[in-house]
């Protein structure tokens, strides 16, 4: 028999899709993609501020159709005839917005801010059917099994990220302080269905048995991730070519992935389709999970640097 568990997955920074049955469907097919965007830049406040922005949209769709016919010749003289057909469609679309702001408050102080926001989604649909017949040593062709696999779903996602840099000179030449901070937040929601049906002829009467093997499941998946990091650096000139650099770095990240699986309340089916019925659906703990990861890292360090036109030497120590 055939069938089994699956469920596609569509991820990406505002533009991405996927999914799969893991069967005969592979790459290739017909793919169309497109993109377009806008860019702009401005000098403001008598040149003290440089501001630029950009927007990009891209999308794609693909279609794959495959068919196979295979004959296996057995040692005893019998033959297995295996036929498969399959189709796959995928669509994606996403938007990206970005800004770059570089502002100089004075010859000694400036900031740089580069935020970006992406959002988008996609959908997929895959279907394959199969049949296997046996030609015995008596030359008679008999039914063995037949069925189909299908999976389909859609997702929505967004990502917000950015970088902030503050730079400050502190009077004495070479004495500086800087702060570099980064952030990233993302979310992806997906609903997908995984269905399969397999019929067999166990008693070899050339009639399909009345109780096919059916998989009829729904998946609700959510992925969230967050990260923050920052690095503070102070530089002090000790002598003409000797500098002391003291730094502190902090980073935090958290990710959570949840997958809830459900079995259909009923299993109504026809030729090439199964209906998922949310009424009476049952949570499937075996294929559900929740994973949480969280990390915090801190580091402090001191570095002595000797710099000349031809040589740079460093000696440092750090603690986590």
Task: List where the protein language model places each region.
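Primarily recognizes Gram-negative and organellar outer-membrane beta-barrels
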Residues: 1-320
């Amino acid at each position: 028999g055939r069938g089994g568990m699956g469920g596609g997955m569509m991820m990406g920074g505002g533009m991405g899709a996927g999914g799969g049955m893991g069967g005969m469907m592979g790459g290739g097919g017909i793919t169309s993609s497109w993109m377009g965007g806008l860019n702009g830049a401005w000098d403001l406040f008598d040149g003290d501020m440089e501001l630029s922005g950009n927007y990009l949209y891209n999308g794609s769709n693909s279609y794959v159709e495959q068919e196979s016919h295979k004959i296996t010749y057995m040692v005893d003289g019998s033959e297995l005839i295996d036929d498969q057909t399959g189709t796959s469609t995928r669509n994606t679309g996403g938007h990206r917005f970005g800004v770059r702001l570089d502002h100089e408050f004075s010859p000694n102080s400036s900031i740089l801010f580069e935020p970006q926001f992406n959002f988008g989604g996609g959908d997929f649909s895959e279907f394959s059917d199969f049949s296997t017949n046996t030609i015995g040593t008596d030359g008679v062709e008999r039914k063995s099994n037949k069925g189909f696999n299908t999976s389909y779903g859609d997702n929505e996602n967004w990502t917000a990220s950015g970088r902030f840099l503050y730079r400050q000179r502190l009077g004495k030449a070479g004495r500086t302080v800087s702060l570099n901070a980064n952030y990233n937040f993302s979310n992806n929601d997906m609903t997908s269905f995984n269905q399969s049906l397999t019929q067999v002829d166990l008693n070899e009467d050339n009639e399909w048995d009345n109780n096919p093997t059916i998989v009829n499941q729904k998946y609700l998946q959510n992925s969230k991730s967050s990260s923050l990091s920052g690095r503070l650096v102070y530089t002090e000139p000790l002598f003409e070519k000797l500098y002391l650099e003291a730094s502190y770095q902090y980073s935090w990240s958290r990710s959570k992935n949840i997958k809830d699986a459900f079995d259909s309340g009923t299993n109504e089916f026809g030729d090439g389709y199964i209906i998922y019925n949310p009424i009476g659906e049952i949570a499937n703990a075996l294929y559900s999970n929740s994973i949480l990861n969280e990390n915090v890292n801190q580091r402090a360090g001191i570095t002595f640097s000797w710099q000349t036109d031809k040589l740079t030497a460093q000696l440092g120590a750090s603690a986590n």
